[in-house]
Amino acid sequence: MEGLEENGSVQVGELLPCKICGRTFFPVALKKHGPICQKTATKKRKTFDSSRQRAEGTDIPTVKPLKPRPEPPKKPSNWRRKHEEFIATIRAAKGLGQVLKEGGKLPPPPPPSYDPDYIQCPYCQRRFNENAADRHINFCKEQAARISNKGKFSTDTKGKSTSRTQYKPPALKKFNSPGTTSSGSSRLPQPSGTSKTVVGAPSGKVSSVSSSSGNKLQTLSPSHKGIPAPHVGTNIKPRNSTPPSLARNPASGVLTSKRKTYSDSYMARPDGDYISSFNGGNTKGIEGNSAGHLPKFCHECGTKYPVEWAKFCCECGVRRMVL
């Protein structure tokens, strides 16, 4: 350069490239540039932190630089195993399509493939990535503990319910009245020969309800209240006995006078109840409470009832019978 300044003219010559950075210099300048370029190439330059420069002269404290995290080691790729599984699935799909076209027995499905890099959960047997497995296993552990506790509570409640249902009340003591020797003080109805006749049963069918007049007399007697009962005669008639005028004979021709019997002996009400009168007394009954069987066809005109709960015939208007 001194020679250039002295002469006052620019020397034109060949430019030589630098071996390190590749730039071209004159031979005189290249001798000075060579050691400087080599030193800067080997020396690592610190990264410039602009946040520190901006924080200078303010109250903001300088933040410590974060240390770079070491990169995790790369896992070896299992590309060969994945390739073989892919080929196996394609072959299985082709074989299934061929069997469906030709017809025949279906081949067994290919075995499931598992990624060896995944971690299996010991509670639900599912597989997850490392990061997901750390979160899932703790959650699944809590869920399994809750389910086991619920099972314990359910067994405890079952035991309590069984103990409640198996409870039996203490047996009542029976006290015999002083006037009787048998255990007649029980209030439960006992079977007897008397029966209650249901009025209006067709074709002489009579539905009898067992009742005991002796029990009713005994409950109304003074001996039921702890007072000695007087001598009861044997010729006492039961209160609910059937009058002889209402007793029907199956051999009599009742089938010809069904409509007349229903119209004379029953008084229908709009709510579906009926009143049967005999000997000056009224007896109320409900068809829903009767244990009889309802016919499917009308006994007057033979028309089939459209619904099971019909009370009257839709053609002739006659009330439905109770068998």
UniProtKB/Swiss-Prot annotation:
<dbReference type="InterPro" id="IPR026319">
    <property type="entry name" value="ZC2HC1A/B-like"/>
</dbReference>
<keyword id="KW-0862">Zinc</keyword>
<feature type="modified residue" description="Phosphoserine">
    <location>
        <position position="221"/>
    </location>
</feature>
<dbReference type="InterPro" id="IPR049899">
    <property type="entry name" value="Znf_C2HC_C3H"/>
</dbReference>
<feature type="modified residue" description="Phosphoserine">
    <location>
        <position position="290"/>
    </location>
</feature>
<feature type="zinc finger region" description="C2HC/C3H-type 1">
    <location>
        <begin position="14"/>
        <end position="43"/>
    </location>
</feature>
<dbReference type="Pfam" id="PF13913">
    <property type="entry name" value="zf-C2HC_2"/>
</dbReference>
<feature type="binding site">
    <location>
        <position position="18"/>
    </location>
    <ligand>
        <name>Zn(2+) 1</name>
    </ligand>
</feature>
<feature type="region of interest" description="Disordered">
    <location>
        <begin position="149"/>
        <end position="258"/>
    </location>
</feature>
<feature type="region of interest" description="Disordered">
    <location>
        <begin position="42"/>
        <end position="81"/>
    </location>
</feature>
<keyword id="KW-0597">Phosphoprotein</keyword>
<keyword id="KW-0479">Metal-binding</keyword>
<feature type="binding site">
    <location>
        <position position="21"/>
    </location>
    <ligand>
        <name>Zn(2+) 1</name>
    </ligand>
</feature>
<feature type="compositionally biased region" description="Basic and acidic residues">
    <location>
        <begin position="47"/>
        <end position="57"/>
    </location>
</feature>
<feature type="binding site">
    <location>
        <position position="124"/>
    </location>
    <ligand>
        <name>Zn(2+) 2</name>
    </ligand>
</feature>
<protein>
    <recommendedName>
        <fullName>Zinc finger C2HC domain-containing protein 1A</fullName>
    </recommendedName>
</protein>
<dbReference type="GO" id="GO:0008270">
    <property type="term" value="F:zinc ion binding"/>
</dbReference>
<feature type="binding site">
    <location>
        <position position="121"/>
    </location>
    <ligand>
        <name>Zn(2+) 2</name>
    </ligand>
</feature>
<feature type="binding site">
    <location>
        <position position="37"/>
    </location>
    <ligand>
        <name>Zn(2+) 1</name>
    </ligand>
</feature>
<comment type="similarity">
    <text>Belongs to the ZC2HC1 family.</text>
</comment>
<feature type="binding site">
    <location>
        <position position="33"/>
    </location>
    <ligand>
        <name>Zn(2+) 1</name>
    </ligand>
</feature>
<feature type="binding site">
    <location>
        <position position="136"/>
    </location>
    <ligand>
        <name>Zn(2+) 2</name>
    </ligand>
</feature>
<feature type="binding site">
    <location>
        <position position="140"/>
    </location>
    <ligand>
        <name>Zn(2+) 2</name>
    </ligand>
</feature>
<feature type="compositionally biased region" description="Low complexity">
    <location>
        <begin position="198"/>
        <end position="214"/>
    </location>
</feature>
<keyword id="KW-0677">Repeat</keyword>
<feature type="zinc finger region" description="C2HC/C3H-type 2">
    <location>
        <begin position="117"/>
        <end position="146"/>
    </location>
</feature>
<feature type="compositionally biased region" description="Polar residues">
    <location>
        <begin position="177"/>
        <end position="197"/>
    </location>
</feature>
<feature type="modified residue" description="Phosphothreonine">
    <location>
        <position position="242"/>
    </location>
</feature>
<keyword id="KW-0863">Zinc-finger</keyword>
